[in-house]
Amino acid sequence: MYYCYLRAKRNELLAIRDCAEKIKSANISIILEPVRKNLTELITCFNSILDSDDSSNLVYILNPIVGDLSNNQFDIIEQANQITKQFHNITLGIIVDQRTDYSQVEYWISLFPGNSFVLIHFGEIPNPNTINNIPQIISNIFYSGHVSDNYISLFTKNKILLEDCFNRLNRNYDYQHSMVEFFSDRHLNYRNYGFQGFANFSTIGDYYAEGGTQPYTTAFHLTFNNEQNAVINIRHWLSDPRTYREPISILNEELLEDIYNMINQNSSLLAWSSACNELVQYHNLNNYSYSLGTLKRLSVRHHFELMAHLKDIGIY
């Protein structure tokens, strides 16, 4: 099973809503880390992907480590209470690491005794054997590179491997040196390593920032499967390099022309990628006024659609 870890910003939530039916049909699960108090947006998103009798395809994290809520326990609990009132059996997540005490895990579970829980291991919690005895914990998600194989072996319940597959560079311009890169092959081999699921941070990576300045160069990132060996690669498109800022519409026009040419050469994408179809529409209408957030939304949406497509054709 594929799990997608996202921070709950507006465009990420829109990408989920855009792809709700494909997410459900492909049995994709969302791990959602709230970053601000945005209950209305969250509820709207949840309504699109959760069934009234089954909320197992979403993990809502109770203790975010980035964003406005990371140090605001009152708002975290208040928002979580509102969510669990509407989605009674939603799965809740707890981020744990080497600083986490067993009593902290017990505390979160005591607040929501009727829910199932998933632990997201961003480090190695002391005395992990005690965790195996908590019946409400149904799965463990292990962040690769942050925990050891020996630590993972101590857990007996459902195991998911989380990886950051996106090679984030400091400047968009830097992607010119490697326009096509390996992204992941975990969908092909996760069971061989003893995992019941695999997870990543989509085409955003384990990165969080609020706002930001307008870039000199815009970038768009698109995942695709290599038809020779079924691994997933990622391609980067850039607007023309420059040393001064210009209106986003000018950068988007340069960027979109190259993307459109690629889609024309790989027209089979249009059969399953609504994100690529939307990009074609922008090109045909000479519409270049969309925001950088829209590019991110389309990139994330396309990745959902790719994973659903690979599931449909039996790749994993």
Predicted regions and their residues:
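N-terminal basic/disordered segments at the start of proteins
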Residues: M1-A26
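Short acidic, S/G/P-rich loop/turn micro-motifs used as interaction or catalytic elements
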Residues: N11, P34-T40, P64-L69, D97-S103, ...
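Histidine-anchored nucleotide/phosphate-binding helix
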Residues: I16-E21, T40-S55
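Conserved, mostly hydrophobic/aromatic
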Residues: I30
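A broadly used, surface-exposed interaction patch
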Residues: S48-P113
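Internal, conserved structured core segments that host functional sites
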Residues: Y102-I137
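Long, charge-rich C-terminal accessory regions
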Residues: N129-E278
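Hydrophobic, glycine-enriched assembly/anchoring segments
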Residues: S268-Y316
